[in-house]
Amino acid sequence: MLRSDEEDYIEDDFYTGFVKNYRGGKYAFMALLPKKKKAKTFWKRAIEQTDFKAYYDSRSYAEVVARIPEFEIATDMELTGFCQSIGIKSIFNPDADFSGMTTQEPLMVSSVLQKAVIKVDRAGTKAAAVSAMYVVAGCAPDFDNIKYVELDRPFVYAVVDRESGLPVFSGVVNKL
């Protein structure tokens, strides 16, 4: 387990978590650990129902001692059906209009695939084009108000854009 001292704490009825800001200031790692009494419903909620932006916006200042497992996850997903289910349909039609991008015709999208890889280790985080180093705060903490978050069971994570609070990469670690 990696140990990290953070200052952004997240807690509600379902999750306890933290935000770890990456060097450079553009992105942050957010981890949400389901509370033990909520763990049975965790899989129902996991990614689809987790509003990462709302959690990012709800963070509050606290001294947080975070324990993070080293992990690496790679996934391959076929997203054609998902794209169509959210209304992106015309690009799959043989009559799709791509005239604003090319003069070559006829063009259509046959499938949408995604390969995602995230690796969190002592050197930092690598996810697609996102990388970071761990930074430790350097002031004396108020020991009575320290929050402890140990990611020792399945949890949700996201790499979020700090300006918008929106995830650029998200997933679930279900095996430690």
Language model region names:
Residues 1-176:
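Secretory/exported precursors with cleavable N-terminal leaders
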